[in-house]
């Protein structure tokens, strides 16, 4: 794809590591994925699980790429005007009341001692056997 996505973050990691893209050729520039996230097209179980699995996948990649410093999630709550529900929680309206989505708990476990055990549930959904080998080599 011509766009940087969670699936091809290695391309951005490679780009930022090139001396031609470093400050004065030697200092790595900070790269933060901001206003980023995965969405749940609906509040159906599978869509919510896909969103959480997508976050887990991205988190594991980001933390294994030296060129990417972190991710700033797009929004805590889904917003009707956004066009896609990227929030960690559902709409904060009378119907949904900002209820936590599965991605909320996944986000909470990220970077803690519970991360590996909790994230394991998403391996099959993503279609991989382990997090090993998640990072692709970019020539």
Where are these regions (language model features)?
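Aromatic-rich peripheral "rim/lid" segments of glycoside hydrolase catalytic domains that contact
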Residues: 40-139
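Noncatalytic carbohydrate-binding groove/subsite architecture in carbohydrate-active enzymes
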Residues: 1-45
């Amino acid at each position: 794809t011509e766009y940087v996505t969670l699936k091809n973050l290695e391309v951005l990691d490679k780009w930022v590591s090139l001396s031609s893209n470093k400050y004065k050729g030697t200092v790595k520039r900070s790269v933060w994925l901001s206003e980023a996230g995965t969405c749940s097209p609906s509040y159906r179980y599978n869509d919510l699980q896909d969103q959480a699995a997508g976050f887990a996948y991205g988190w594991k990649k980001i933390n294994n790429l030296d060129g990417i410093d972190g991710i700033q999630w797009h929004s805590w709550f889904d917003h009707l005007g956004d066009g896609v529900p990227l929030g960690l929680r559902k709409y904060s309206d009378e119907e949904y009341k900002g209820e936590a989505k599965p991605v909320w708990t996944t986000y909470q476990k990220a970077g803690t001692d519970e991360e590996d055990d909790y994230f394991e549930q998403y391996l099959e959904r993503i279609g991989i056997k382990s997090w090993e080998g998640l990072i692709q080599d970019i020539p």
